[in-house]
């Protein structure tokens, strides 16, 4: 069942808190870009896209291509809150050995459909 507007707004607040906590704990990152993308990703992942955290490789899922990889914290938060991995893992952002690095690596984390770095890279991947 899809969340209503109030639930989506509440999720947006949780994701914003996650981003601030993650980048503060990491001592680095791009919180501004991540914060500017919250409503977009929450709307897509919780109200529009067809995906299943229990089956991250489901062939018929909708795919999300993050072109500006430096805003990975917002994507990580949305994936965790969707159930792809534990929310507690968010505080490992940019730590040695963490699956959550500054730019997403699709082989390191379930739910990622591309690895990104350079701005605009996603245009050719989509």
Tell where the protein language model's regions lie, with residue ranges.
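N-terminal capping segment at the start of a domain
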Residues: 12-28
